[in-house]
Amino acid sequence: MKVRASVKKICEKCRVIRRRGRVMVICVNPKHKQRQG
């Protein structure tokens, strides 16, 4: 899980979602998981 000020899709499988008011990126590749913070 990467914590970043700006989250972006890294590949075409990445999905930007909102969970509990946080913007997150989920992907089949665990290295692409990101959270805004």
Curated annotation (Swiss-Prot):
Superkingdom, natural source: Bacteria
InterPro entries found in the cross-reference section: Ribosomal_bL36, Ribosomal_bL36_sp
Short name of any one Pfam family annotated for the protein: Ribosomal_L36
CC annotations in GO: cytoplasm; ribonucleoprotein complex; ribosome
The keyword ATP-binding belongs to this UniProt entry's keyword annotation: no
Keywords (A to Z) from UniProt: Ribonucleoprotein, Ribosomal protein
Similarity-based family: Belongs to the bacterial ribosomal protein bL36 family.
Protein name: Large ribosomal subunit protein bL36
Native species: Trichodesmium erythraeum (strain IMS101)
Gene: rpmJ
